[in-house]
Amino acid sequence: MNKKSPDTEKVSNYDYLEKMNTFELLSNINKEDHTIAENVKKQIPSIEKLVDEIIPRIDSGGRLFYIGAGTSGRLGVLDASECPPTFGVSPGIVIGLIAGGDTALRNAVENAEDDTNQAWKDLQEYDISEKDVLVGIAASGTTPYVIGGIKDARNNGIITGCITCSSGSPLAEASEYPIEVVTGPEFVTGSTRMKAGTAQKLVLNMISTSVMIKLGRVKGNKMVDMQLSNDKLVGRGIRMIMEDLNIEKEQAEKLLLEHKSVRKVLDAHKNERN
């Protein structure tokens, strides 16, 4: 029986791309991009199920792992790396792994994604356990590295989810909580760094942001736990304090310098009022 080809490998709706002028190229790429958010919207119920599994596990000391290869792996590493500065969590709470290791973040590592056993070896270096959650990311849903990792994790009692852009894929079938954002043919046939990659980034944003909000890492709409690692973020923290406490800039600067954290400033002020 012939296996179904991934949706991400379907032939582009456009042809003779090299004959288009620059405006036509940009307009057609943009036209395709307009379809992405609506396709993500269709998967909100599936995203919700996965998020609601992640929250209690991190709250109980567990972690969230992402695994992927190529663009998918890079997006997982990107999302994981943004959680500490944005939400003030330890770098070990959300962990992104890419087939081929950190070298693959900049340069393709030949055949790295074809090893079905390597992901589990990589995960074991972090002592992954049933307290954690593993999310596999693969546009086609056929990447051996990711499928192997998901299957091994599930066999060891670990909650698994996935983000894929092809329906009925082996990865989705292997995962307990599949998210299938079917983005259709790419503008450049098979170039999943385009629509599929954008869709995956949107879903990752939704997962990590909603998890951190539900874990109390946002107050109102503000990143009160963000790391004050540069002048821009210090300025943002000062503005948050000014707005929340209705005070002048000089006083806000003094409080932030004293407490080193927006949350600590706001909590201290709250305790004073009580």
From Swiss-Prot:
Gene3D superfamilies the record matches: 1.10.8.1080, Glucose-6-phosphate isomerase like protein, domain 1
Pfam families attached to this UniProt entry: GKRP_SIS_N (PF22645)
Q: Tell me the protein's name.
A: N-acetylmuramic acid 6-phosphate etherase
Its biological purpose: Specifically catalyzes the cleavage of the D-lactyl ether substituent of MurNAc 6-phosphate, producing GlcNAc 6-phosphate and D-lactate.
Further remark, if any? A lyase-type mechanism (elimination/hydration) is suggested for the cleavage of the lactyl ether bond of MurNAc 6-phosphate, with the formation of an alpha,beta-unsaturated aldehyde intermediate with (E)-stereochemistry, followed by the syn addition of water to give product.
Domain (SIS) ranges: 54-217
Q: Which HAMAP family match?
A: MurQ
Q: Which reaction does it catalyse?
A: N-acetyl-D-muramate 6-phosphate + H2O = N-acetyl-D-glucosamine 6-phosphate + (R)-lactate
- Pathway noted in the entry: Amino-sugar metabolism; N-acetylmuramate degradation
State which Enzyme Commission number(s) the record gives. Answer: 4.2.1.126
Keyword terms: Carbohydrate metabolism, Lyase
- UniProt family annotation: Belongs to the GCKR-like family. MurNAc-6-P etherase subfamily.
Q: Which InterPro entries match?
A: Etherase_MurQ, Glucokinase_regulatory_CS, MURQ/GCKR, SIS_dom, SIS_dom_sf
Highest taxon, organism lineage: Bacteria
Keyword match ATP-binding: no
